[in-house]
């Protein structure tokens, strides 16, 4: 990110989308039980995204930093029986990489960054 931040800020356009997981939430359903190392690593990713977004002005410098939960997708990790295809799991990441952003936007969705997203919605963590 250090290498990419300056050119993205200069161009006033850029998106950093980091894959995480809803299992890294600190609140909400399914936030306890099993997979502790995985959960803790994803909680760390979510915290990193939040902090990087704040350090870069929450979009005011021209680029966004967000985390995405791709859900249980058919990948090497998700396995062949996962309910979503890899393409379906990637839809929110693609949306984040291409979405419009307005720091002064009229809706909350227009000006959110530094959060965890799932199915194009913010996931409280």
Name each model-derived stretch:
Residues 2-59, 69, 82:
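Catalytic loop of short-chain dehydrogenase/reductase
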Residues 59-63, 67-68, 75, 79-125:
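C-terminal helical subdomain
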